[in-house]
Curated annotation (Swiss-Prot):
A matching Pfam family: Ribosomal_L4
GO biological process, one term: translation
GO MF annotation terms: rRNA binding; structural constituent of ribosome
This protein's name: Large ribosomal subunit protein uL4
Any one Gene Ontology cellular component term annotated for this protein: ribonucleoprotein complex
Chain spans, region Disordered: 49-75
InterPro entries: Ribosomal_uL4, Ribosomal_uL4-like, Ribosomal_uL4_dom_sf
HAMAP family registered for this protein in UniProt: Ribosomal_uL4_B (MF_01328_B)
Gene3D superfamilies: 3.40.1370.10
NCBIfam families (alphabetical): rplD_bact
Subunit structure of this chain's protein: Part of the 50S ribosomal subunit.
Biological function: One of the primary rRNA binding proteins, this protein initially binds near the 5'-end of the 23S rRNA. It is important during the early stages of 50S assembly. It makes multiple contacts with different domains of the 23S rRNA in the assembled 50S subunit and ribosome.
Phylogenetic classification of the source organism: Bacteria, Bacillati, Bacillota, Bacilli, Lactobacillales
Keywords: Ribonucleoprotein, Ribosomal protein, RNA-binding, rRNA-binding
């Protein structure tokens, strides 16, 4: 079992916690991590691109010249693709780029990135994040105490609304509940701060 320090909000050590090696100490699988990141990024694409094909372009209802006798190539509409102002051939249309990878593969990717954070000493476990009221400065001070003043992902309990509201104004801080933890956000974060109770919940879901 891998042991890490559990810190208080002031940065002092409160205790130690044993992490499940099946979740936080596996050999990272870079190929699966890549698959998971690409899947999430594809799902974020809006896919609202669109152009007009010959059926959507206005005009062109009349045959521009007679079929035979002019010496020109036959044409049925001035909105055919070869004409200026005509429709686009095989242009992009609105679509969803979302796709899914297997659940076990995604779980392996999540365990891989969590293990990588532990190996890189970028995981901070805090005993609790409790605030009397939502206040950005208080939250910022706690992150400074935890040496997490760069791009930080904070994972909290479901009911920790004060912590979630306190971090909304901080540009480089993202707060989410345990159920929302995902590969892309963990990869993008420089530091990963997790409340101790959330560690147990993550291990219960992935072990």
């Amino acid at each position: 079992m891998t042991k890490v320090a559990v810190l208080k909000q002031d940065g002092s050590q409160a205790a130690e916690i044993e992490l499940n090696d099946a979740v936080f100490a596996i050999e990272p699988n870079n190929a699966v991590i890549t698959d998971a990141v690409l899947m999430q990024r594809a799902s974020l694409r809006q896919g609202t691109h669109a152009v007009k094909n010959r059926s959507a372009v206005s005009g062109g209802g009349r045959k521009p010249w007679k079929q035979k006798g002019t010496g020109r190539a036959r044409a049925g509409s001035i909105r055919e693709p070869q004409f200026r102002g005509g429709g686009i051939v095989f242009g992009p249309s609105p679509r969803s780029y979302a796709y899914r990878i297997n659940r076990k593969a995604y779980q392996l990717a999540l365990k891989s990135v969590l293990s990588q954070k532990v190996a890189d000493n970028k995981l901070v476990v805090v005993d609790a994040l409790s605030f009397e009221a939502p206040k950005t400065q208080d939250f910022k001070k706690v992150l400074a105490n935890l040496s997490a003043d760069k791009k930080t992902l904070v994972v909290v309990d479901e009911d920790n609304e004060n912590a979630i509201l306190s971090a909304r104004n901080l540009a480089n801080v993202q707060v989410m509940t345990t159920k929302g933890i995902n590969v892309l956000d963990v990869v993008n974060a420089d530091k990963l701060v997790i409340v101790q109770s959330s560690i147990e919940e993550i291990q219960g879901g992935l072990a």
